[in-house]
Each structure stands twice: as C-alpha cells, then as structure tokens.
C-alpha cells in the first residue's frame, strides 16, 4: 500500500528594501538552502501572481508569511486586528535628516518655526508609510528645537501610488518640491537621505540618527519587527524556528564580514550604491542584524505605536507585550549562543563613525 503523500507547507517571506537579516540570508542563498528538503515550498512574496498576496507585506493578512520590514505597517495591521505576532526585532540605525535649501536661512530645528514642512501623500495607500515616517522625523526635530509640532505648517507633496514590489527607483518628489521652492524643508532617511545631503545646494538641519536617546531615533526602519501569523506559528513552530535560525546564522556571519555587508544590502536598495548604504548606516551596520527581543527594542516599537496613535495613523490601541511571542527566538538563541556585542550602536559611536566616513 502506497503511503499517503503530503503537500509541502507553503512559506512566504518578505523584506522591504533596506538592511534586513532576511535580505542578507536570501542574497547568500542560506534561506533557500534551509528549506530545500521538499517539505516546505519557500516563496518570495514579491513574486506572487496575486496582487492581494503581494500587498500582504502591508496588511499582514497572508497565512504562512514571515515578514521583516518597517514597523509602521506592522503596527497598523495589528491595530486593525490582524493576528500576526512579533517573533524578533532588529535595530539598524540609519540616516534621518531634515534637509533645506542652503539659501533658506534655516540652520537649526528652531528655525523651522512657521516654515512649510513637506509631507509626502499617497492618497490610495492602505497606510501611508512615507507620510508617517516623514511626520515622525519632523515631530522629533521640532520638539528638539523647542517647538510645538501641533503648530507646524504641513504641506502635501503628492506621490504616485505603487504596488509592492517597487522594482524601479522612485522619483525624488520630495527633493523636487524642495528645490522648486514648493516647501521649505523635507525629511529623508536611509541611503536616499544620505545621498541627497551630499548636494552642496542643500543644508542638513539635523540628523536624528546622532541623538544619544534611542527613542529619538525611532522611525519606520528603526526598529524593524519580524512577524508571522499566529495560526501558522501554532501549526508549524519548527518551520518558524528554522527560519529564525537562518537569520541568526546570517547575523553572526555579518558580524565578521563588515566589508561585504554593504554590497549585499545595496542589492535591496534600488538606485543606491554600497558606499551610500555604508554612509547611511555607518560602519557598525554589520553588527546590527541580529534578531532580538531585548527591552530597548520593544520600547522602540511601543514609542512608535504611541506616535501613530497620537497622530491618528492608527485608530485602535493594543498591548505591545501581547503582540510578542518570545518562545521561537528564545529556543533558537539557546542553541546558537549569539555574540553578546550585537545590539543598538550608541549614537556617540555613530557620530565618530560618521566623521570617519565623511573623511574618506
């Protein structure tokens, strides 16, 4: 009698352009190798034929999806009642700059009083990540300058809608609006922001990534949660543990291969070079990819949730601790014994590293 056959378990993975442990594991082929035994059908979400499945990177409604990406969509989805839980968090600091025209007369955050602050706007987005990210950056800068963000003058910068994945380099519509004089200041982060600030016609009012307080550095990409839907985790905990083990392996490899990591990350950042990735994240990038659930990372998610509630990007509050399931990662870390140095780079170390990069 022929034994019954079982269909492979469908496992989707997703990571948005940026420095992620998942992206590194995919670039090196480790994730594919870990699930090549035939029992699991590993698929990239961006390759799905269904638009709704692709958009699960934002709405988190696809079963069998392990997602590593920006925190705004993850928090929004949880607020909307999705069952995805956080099984790990990475903290990769990145450039976060308020930029103005050099001839604007704006030199410090306090000088932003009464100025036109540009916020991108995507009218059809499930959750407008870019707008929330920019407003978060401005609010932090205004508060550091002793100003009331509620009194700020916000100006819409219309952005075209797009579907995940965004394969082409996006137009720099915020930069266009700034240079054309439609707004007085914009917020840019990551490699895009780092590349833009090299323009001698622009002035950097503040780089929030230089703040000592990590909660002042919280934005869409910092911290990044790793999520999976609760039903899939309950049915297939061994698959989730295997996935996390690959990310831990990749993070440990990255910690000793700093020269290679920026090039690998740049492959997931369309239109930007390894040098720009290194400039945006600093030379400690390779030591920042280890998934963790340390209290400071969780506090970063809680701070972002507070902001999104206060500024009405989400409608419903929820308990951060109930959103997190620490068991899978705890099981993996007991086996892999990660290096103790992996964690959030201190801003003072970032400032030194940034000076070293600019001196090259």
Predicted regions and their residues:
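Conserved C-terminal helix/tail region of periplasmic/extracytoplasmic solute-binding proteins
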Residues: 308-360
């Amino acid at each position: 009698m022929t034994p019954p056959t079982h269909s492979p378990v469908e496992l989707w993975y997703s990571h948005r352009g940026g420095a992620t442990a998942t992206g590194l594991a995919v670039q090196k082929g480790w994730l594919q190798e870990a699930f090549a035994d035939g029992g699991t059908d590993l698929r990239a979400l961006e390759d799905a034929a269904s638009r709704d499945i692709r958009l699960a990177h934002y709405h988190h409604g696809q079963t069998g999806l392990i997602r590593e990406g920006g925190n705004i969509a993850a928090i929004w989805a949880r607020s909307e009642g999705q069952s995805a839980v956080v099984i790990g968090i990475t903290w990769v600091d990145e450039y976060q700059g308020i930029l103005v025209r050099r001839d604007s007369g704006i030199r410090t955050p306090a000088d932003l009083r009464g100025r036109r602050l540009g916020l991108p706007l995507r009218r059809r987005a499930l959750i407008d990540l870019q707008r929330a990210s920019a407003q978060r950056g401005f609010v932090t800068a205004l508060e550091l300058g002793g100003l009331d963000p509620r009194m700020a003058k916000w100006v819409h910068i219309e952005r075209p809608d797009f579907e995940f994945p965004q394969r082409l380099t996006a137009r720099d519509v915020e930069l266009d609006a700034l240079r054309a004089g439609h707004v007085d200041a914009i917020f840019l982060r990551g490699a895009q922001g780092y590349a833009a600030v090299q323009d001698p016609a622009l002035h950097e009012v503040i780089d929030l990534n230089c703040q000592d307080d990590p909660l002042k550095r919280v934005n869409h990409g910092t911290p990044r949660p790793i999520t999976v839907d609760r039903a899939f985790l309950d049915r297939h905990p061994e698959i989730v543990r295997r996935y996390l083990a690959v990310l831990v392996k990749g993070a440990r490899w990255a910690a000793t291969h700093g020269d290679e990591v920026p090039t690998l990350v740049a492959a997931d950042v369309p239109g930007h070079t390894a040098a720009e990735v290194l400039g945006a994240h600093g030379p400690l990038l390779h030591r920042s990819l280890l998934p963790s659930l340390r209290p400071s990372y969780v506090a970063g998610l809680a701070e972002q949730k507070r902001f999104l509630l206060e500024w009405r990007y989400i409608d419903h509050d929820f308990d951060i601790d109930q959103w997190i399931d620490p068991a899978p990662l705890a099981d993996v870390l007991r086996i892999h014994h990660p290096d103790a140095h992996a964690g959030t780079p201190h801003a003072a170390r970032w400032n030194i590293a940034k000076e070293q990069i600019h001196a090259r």
